[in-house]
Structure formats: C-alpha cells, structure tokens
C-alpha cells in the first residue's frame, strides 16, 4: 500500500513518476492557471485505500469551489523511494535497523516529523510534516541517506558559474534544497567548466535544467569595452551627461564612462546583445564624427584662474560645452602648466575662447595688509564681523593665513573691491584702539596662571577686558600673548608678571613627620591644621593618605613662607615628641579615690597644673593599679614624684633601694613581669620599681608601708643571690579551680609554703594559655620540698569530705539572691566546694552543708562566718533621687549599678515604678531639688516628704553605704538648652533619625528636638552627665555651622541663566545620545534644561542653565560657540537613488557614520513615505559639503551597478505566467466532476484484493494509514 499527501504542485510533479499507481490528495494549489482545466481527480484526489470511504460525503461543486485555500504554516509532503533505489532493504520488522536510527537523527536535526510506511511492492513511502524550511531540509537528508545516489555533470561557460552560486552562495543553497541534490562547482582557479550534480534521477534532471536556464539567460546579456581617446569623452557624455543618458534610455544599455579624474580610456557597455550593439555603434559614430570635425587651440590662463574656468563641480566647463559644443581641457592641479586646450569645431572655437576668458576674469584676488594678531578681532566672536561682509556678498571668499600679516579676498571683481575697502576700515580702527603685549613665563607655571577651571585667567580677562593666549602644554612654549584695550593690556601684563614672579619664588619642601603624629597635628575635625593654614595662608600643606603609611608631609608656597611654616611645624613635632614621653605610676588600691578626688577634681587639677595627659586604670580586682601619665619627660617624672608623694603622705610609705646587678633585672622581672608580680602579690601592698633598660643602673626601688618593706627587699636579694649561684625550676599541674585555695586568702597558704621551703611559686595569669601549669623556682632542695608540699595540698583537695555549720535562717536569703551569686563566688574561691542550704518547706532549719576537699571546706566555713558577721553589722540607708532619673542611673542593662555594687560591697534596691501617679499641678521643690510626692491617699501626704517611688535603698556597712550614695548622686543627669534655628532641626535629626542618634551615641547624652508643630521654638534640650554635656553642646554647634555653610552653598548654586537658541539647533547641542550636552554639564558643573516640545506654554527657544554664576556663564559661552559654528554651516539637497540608501548607510549606520566623521558633515536620509525618496540632505561647512556629496555620488554609481544586476536576476527568477496574471480570472474550473456526469461505474467488489489491497501482514483493524502518531 502506498499513500501520499502533497501540499505543493511542484512536489506533486517532482514525485509523480514514482507514484503513478498511487492516488494523490492535493491540499494546496499553485497560483498559476493553465489553459486546460485539471480533471476532478487531479484537483481532488481521494483518500488512501484503507481510509473510510468519503465519496458519499462529497458535495457538489458550488460557489465555495471558487475560493482558493489559504496556505498553512505547517505542510506535509510524501516522498516515495522505489525498492531498487532503497539503501537499506534487509528489515525483519517495521521501524527497526539502521533506517529507523537515520530517521530519528533527521527529525532531531531538522525539527520535522517523519512517518514511514511500506507499499506492497516493498517501496518506501515517507511522510514529512513541519514548516516548509524544515520539510525541505528533511527531504534533502532523506534523499541523501535513504536513497541510492546517482551523479551527472553539466557544462556551462566558466563566467556563468558565479550566477549559479549567487550572492554569498544563497542561490546555490536554494537550488540544492529545491532539487534535493548536491551541486559541486569547480573553484575559480580550476579551468574546468563541468558542474557535478549528485542525487536522485529526478533531482539531477531538475537541477540540470535549472542550471542550463541560468546559463541561457546570461547568454542573452553581453558586456563590451570600447577604447575611446580620453579627450573625446566629454562629447560622448554631452553637457551635464545628457547625451549618454538619452542613449542609455533609448537602448536600455548601461554605459559607464570613466570620470575625468580617472585616467582610463575604456567605455563599458552592459545589456542585451542587440541593444548593446546599437549603443556601441552610436558611440562609435559620435567618436568618428568628432575626430574628423574637431580641431584644437591652446591658450595661456593663469594657474590661479583655472578653478574659475572649471567652476563649482565643473559646472563652468559643462556650461561652455552646452553653449558652444567645445570641450575645454584643463591641466591637472599637480601640474605647473598654464596651457588650456579648447577642442571643437573651428567655427565655434572663437565663441568658446571668449567664454573661457570671461570665466577666468570674472573673479579676482586681492590682499589687505593686517597684523596677524588682529585677524581674530576682524573675524569676530563666532565669525560675526566677517559674516556681515559675506552675507552682503555671498560669492566672495576671504582667507586668513596663520602667521602672515595679510588677508586675501577672492571673488567677483566688484565684490572684492567693496570687501577690501571694508576690511581696510576695520584694520585701521582696530590698530587705533587695540594693542598687544608678549611676555615670557616658564611653561611649567602656565597651569598655575590659568588656575583651577581657568579661574585666574578668566578673572584677568573679565577685569581688564583683554584676551590672553597661553600656549598648550605640548608646545613647551614660554610666550604668552595679551591682546585688547591698550590700558587693559598693560595692567594684565603687570599682574601676570607679578604672579609669575611669585611662582618662581615658590618652592616645595618635604617634611618628615612620623605618621602617628599626623592626626594630632590635624586635630579634631581639622581644627589645628586650620589654625596653621590661617597663620600661613600662602602655604599649601598636604598630608599623605593614611593607607599609604607614609611619613612625608609636603609644603608648597613662597620660599620664605615655606621656611617659616617648616620651622613652626618642626617645633610643633618636637613638642609632640617631647610630650609623648609616658610612664606608669603604681598606686595602692585604697588610695585610688583619694588621688582622683571627688568627681575627678584632684586628678583634673593635677592635669591642668602639669599640662600632661593622665589615663586612669580600670576597676579590676587587683591590690594595686597603674596610672599612665604622658607629657614632657621632665614634667612626667616630676608628676610621678608628686603622685607618689601624695600616696606616701596618705599611707606613710617608705622607700628602700636595693642594689641588684642590671644583668639580673630581666630574670627577676620574668616573662611579662610574672615573677616580680608574684613577689609584690606575696608581700601585699608593695611596689618594686626597676630602672629603665639600658641605663646601666643597678638600683631597684621598693615602696611599701614601714613594716612591710623588709620582706620584699629580702626576697629580691635572696633571689638575686640564688640566681647568681644556682637556679632550679620544676613545673607542677593542678586544676584551675584549686589555684585560689592553694594561694589562700591574701596569699596566706602559698606564703606559708614559700616561707617553709624558700622556693618561688608562680601561678598562671588569666592571659596564659596553659591554666593548669604552676612553676616552682629556687634551689634544687627548696624546689623539691615545695613540690612535695604542693602535691600534698593537691592530693588533699582531691579527697572529698562533707561537713556542716549553723547559719541563722534569716541570713539564708543573702546567699541565694541574684541566682546564688554569693555561693558561686565561694565555690570559685575555695576549690569548687559545694554549699547546700536547707530546702524543706515549713521548717526553719539552720543547718548548712558543705562538701569538698577538707581544706577547702574549712576555708569556706571561715568565709561564710565572715559574711554572717558583715550581715549582722549591716545598715540600710535611703537615697532620694526622682524616679525619672532611675533608668539613666542604672545604665545599659544595669551596668552602672553593678559597678557601684562591686566597688563598694553594698546592695542597692530600686523602688517599683509608680504605674498611676496622681496628677500634681505644682510639685513642691525641696532644698535638694527633688520633687515632692503624695501619699497613698493623696490627701494627708506631706508635701515636703519624698515620694516612695523616688527612694533607693542601699544596704551594707555604714561607711560603704555613704560612699555608694555619693556615687549614685553623681550619676543624676543634668539638662541644658541650646538655641538652634528651627529650619535646621530636620537636618540635625537626619534621615530616619540617623544624625541625632549618631550624636547621642557619640556623646552619651539624650537630645530632645521640639516637635514640628512648635515652629516658633528654636530650643534643643540636651540631657546627660555633666562631664558629657559640654562636649555634646560643642558638637551640636559645630554641626549647625556645617549646615549653615551648606545652605549658603545651595543658594550660590541655584543661580539661573536663560539662553535664546533657535530650536533647530537643539539636537546638535544635545548631541548623539546626549554626549555633547553631558560634556558641557560635567565640565562646568551646571544643570541645563531644554524646553519641553509638548508644552506649548514654554518658549521653545529658551534654554535654562542652573549652577554657580561663573559656571553658568561659561556653559552659556560654550553653547553659543556651538551655535556660532552651526550658523556657518550650509545644507544642500542631493538626488541619490533610494535603492542604494541602505548600502550607503551600512549595518547599524556604521558606513554613514564613517563618512560623516571623515568629512565632518551631517547626512540625513528621507523617511519612509517622504514625497521625494531620493532626496538626501547634507549639512556642514561649504567645502566639506561639496567633498561629501562628490563621495556619495561616486558610491551611488558603484552600487547602482550591483542593483541593476540583482533586478535583472529577480526578473528572470519570476514565474513565466507574470503577464498572464493580468487576464481576468475565470474562477476555479475542473473537468469530469462527478456532479456533472452520469456515474455508470459499478460498485467495487468488497472481496477483491485488487480493489481493496492490504498490507502483507495482519494488522489491527483501527491502524491509521500512516502509522501511530508519535
């Protein structure tokens, strides 16, 4: 069985030979109409044999039969491969083997859908569905891979091969697709003319036919070259090319005459052979006729007048040729010859000669003497002065030669005389009222004379109304020229020389200052460096970038000022170095607050008197602290003695000096001071001071109370003696929680071991990595004895015992408050001992159980007993502070209260917050400034008594409670008011409050800004500790100054200027993608606004410039300069065949942009739908426009040749029925339709296999004709 579905008539005709026995269904018809109408069966083939019978459903033809079907985007074609041409014949089952793989590969490559079926004769039918392009590609693949291939050759002339290939090989590819063949064309360097075709027989025949058709078409056309002497070309072309144009129009032949600038004699003819022969004959006739009749005469014309004879674009020569029929031959421009040859008929040469002399003498050249420096004044701003002359006399050309003292005028004689008189008057006037001066200034100073953005030179120009020309840097010239009013020139010259003299006296000096001092010299917010710059205003001081880690500070300015500034800064640095000497002063913990004083009064006084910086220590739990003092060495040392004297006076301190060799000092101090620290801790309240390293001094100073200095002195001396004789070290390990117990309270336990053995025992500090390592140092005997004692202590700590003691139940709460903090401290201090309080509810047990190492338990019991004694002696006092300050006093997460509690060993309890305080109209003020409160009832409350919510309870020993009360009262915040203009409030607050938050965090205060509704209020409230208020106020006022400066700058920047510019120039000022206007905006830092085209209320010629006044004026001048250049431009329309527009423009406009950039012109092509599609407008300077037009006309001539060839090829490729399509359509006609004939055929025999053929194998009854859908 075979079934086909063909959508195009070409496909039907192509495969008809292989499907003669098959019934064909045509689903789309070709648009061509033939003379003989098709039969009904040809037009409407029945469905395949196995399909349900549709004949009964056929309707008679009616009006609908005349409507032609619309072509579908998806088409279906069927290809039949006969058994003898199949590549793969051995198939056991349908769809298996190599054939199935090839079909899958074709579907993947092309995107088309393939279905295979086998006919009874084992021929292969392939149905291909998809888009037309995909179907054609699949067809080519099927023929190449599933059908055996044949090959044939066809011979055509070698010159016709390129027409078979087509542009970029497109025609060859299309031919291969249509014929499903492979066509091989020999290479250009191969002399063979044989073209090889590979494919099916039908495809080869069709391809061969198409190739021969192309060759035959080219045989009809011919190209001929005729050699004609160059001098006779003008006669053949005729005036303005009229003669050759008429000839081309009459004969339909294309004639190419080389232009006069090209030294070629060949004239090329292209066209149909007969018409071409006519054109060649007519040209030969003209040539022979002119050769016989013409003669020549030679005349001498000045070389400078040749261009007048030629005229613009050769118009004068064409004019003479048209009037007289005489050709005028002008020697080339690079030739020195002045001979002009006239060629023509003798009787017309006289008239032509008259015309030549008339053209030559119609123009004259004249020159006016004028100093070259006056040229630009004669031209005027944007050529305004010169334009007055050229507008009156447009044919005149005025030329200024740089460096020459003359002005050349060229044009009609009368116009030149008038222009010469006007220029002479202008020159005389300018010489009387202008002057110039030249000065020599080293070019390295030129940019300083110009100033930033031309500030200096523009000021001089505006002030003295002069023009100053400073040569560019690349010229390396020292000459500066000043031109303008005589008095202004002299004043400008004087000022420029003064500036240059000052700069020559200027010098640059590098100052070496350590980077660590840079920030100090600059000062907070640049205050100190501002003072230096105010003191030396002519000196520029440049500090290096902090990231560069450079010590070089650069000073630039007048020599004397730089020297003074250098000495001043060197002195400042010397003071900083001198004041950077620092020393640590050890003080005993108990005297710390006495030396600092209440509220830091004492230490502040010491700072002011000594002019030094003193850093206070942290509040760590050490027995002694270090004050860090920084300033002059001598002052710091005196200050150290002064602080130590205060301490000595307070505690009656004794100073003892011990002589220890300096070489042993480092060993005695130990790594990071560990060893000497252990001695000081052991002796308690002792300071040991070593001399500075490298001093060579052997004196070690010990400061201690009168009765305690002997022991540290003895320890130091003993250790030094042992070190000199013998030293022995042993490491011991113990759990960190045992260390405190091993040391004992106040170092009692470890002191006992040291006294017994004489060994030094060093425990790890919190900074050491190994927290279990204990080091024992001394003689071997002492170290071993100390090791035994410590090991025994550690062993005892490992032996856990349980003990109990009696504690009054009223004190139990003290041990468990704050999540059992007291119990945790006892456990940490005494080797992790566990203390358990009674938990039985309803009983008042006083028994407390302790569990741990025996020694630890005993020590813990002693500590608990001490705590109980303190609780028995505890008192409670009240501190009245208004509740509104409680949160501030507590600090973040209660940190301030926790610190006071630790420092003074007291407990502090704040009252509950009062949820609904009774309203008080006028709260009474107490003498201490606290607000009065009311009682619970609000009636009987004493106005003078404090409110309950204001009372803070402090518990502890009386003296400690009083000290804690003073510390609390010192934390009460103070409020001050600062006056700030209301309009600055929103800037101080910042975006989403960021500005005010930053200030509050920086100065640790609360800043309250009045609400926006209170517009009359300028008061900002600052609340915080007294010490922070001054800094906060200064910071706020500094911010106000910055904001006011910004406001002034905004006002200056809002200056507006309006420029009147014709709207037609706006696109040029804006530039491509806004490039020109963006450059002006960026260069002058201004905003430029163009009028809105859609807004009729706006003046369309007004451009608004906003910015600083000077910048706005400079931007205006830049815009007017562009406008001046645009006004000098001209626009010319040139007729350019619209068919070559696309090629001249190029891909994405690249080609036309290149032409515009080369000739500096603007070229505009007509838009689609324009009245004249060939009109192209060229805009630019006159000489550039002429050159650009000549260039694009040459391109047109070159590209039109290709256009003509392409059009001729397209005409050939069109179907032959083009002319027949003009005949009115007869409608759709078929012959032998069933509705028009009597059906005498008998019904088919259902049992006949001839009428109803079937597949060889049994198949399912519902199988579709083309197999299952995939």
Swiss-Prot record:
Biased composition (Polar residues): 1-11
GO MF term (any one): mRNA binding
Subcellular location: Cytoplasm
Bias (Basic and acidic residues) ranges: 933-947
Keyword Acetylation: no
Domain of life: Eukaryota
This protein's GO CC annotations: cytoplasm
SMART domains, per database record: KH (SM00322)
KH domain: residues covered: 150-188, 219-260, 291-333, 360-402, 431-473, 504-545, 577-619, 651-693, 724-766, 798-840, 872-913, 970-1012, 1051-1093, 1126-1168
Classification via InterPro entries: KH_dom, KH_dom_type_1, KH_dom_type_1_sf
Region of interest called Disordered, as start-end residue ranges on this chain: 1-23, 28-47, 911-947, 1217-1270
Keyword DNA-binding set for record: no
SUPFAM superfamilies: Eukaryotic type KH-domain (KH-domain type I) (SSF54791)
UniProt keyword terms in alphabetical order: Cytoplasm, Repeat, RNA-binding
Name of this chain's protein: Vigilin
